Amino acid sequence: MSRVCDVTGLAKSFGNKVSHSNRKTKRSYLVNLHNVTLVSEVLGRKFKMKVAARTLRTINYKGGFDLYLLNTASRKLSDEAQKIKRKIRAAIASGKSLQCGVL
């Protein structure tokens, strides 16, 4: 099972554990993933995803899943999130609007 955030693509990273005597030992940092259901109000759909806790905090701060995707640069999003973002933009262009928030 892959430990990668489905929204941002955040994955396991590597670094050094540094002891008191300043010895450096390789170690890895895992992503704090949670299985969540994110709701798109524009599309009227739910998406089951594995999302990092850091990304969840950012989604709440930005005002919801739709606003987070629309206000985040595409290069910072995973391929799956970019597809959802395109669907949201198409829905808005065809006449649907965000119920809670300003673009």
UniProtKB/Swiss-Prot annotation:
Pfam families named among the record's database cross-references: Ribosomal_L28 (PF00830)
Q: Which family does it belong to?
A: Belongs to the bacterial ribosomal protein bL28 family.
Task: Supply the name of the protein.
Answer: Large ribosomal subunit protein bL28
Matches recorded under InterPro entries: Ribosomal_bL28, Ribosomal_bL28/bL31-like_sf, Ribosomal_bL28_bact-type, Ribosomal_bL28_sf
Q: Which UniProt keywords apply?
A: Ribonucleoprotein, Ribosomal protein
Highest taxon of the source? Answer: Bacteria
GO biological process annotations for this chain's record? Answer: translation
List, in alphabetical order, the Gene Ontology terms for molecular function in this entry. Answer: structural constituent of ribosome
Q: What HAMAP family does UniProt report for this protein, alphabetically?
A: Ribosomal_bL28
Which GO cellular component term is one of those annotated? ribonucleoprotein complex
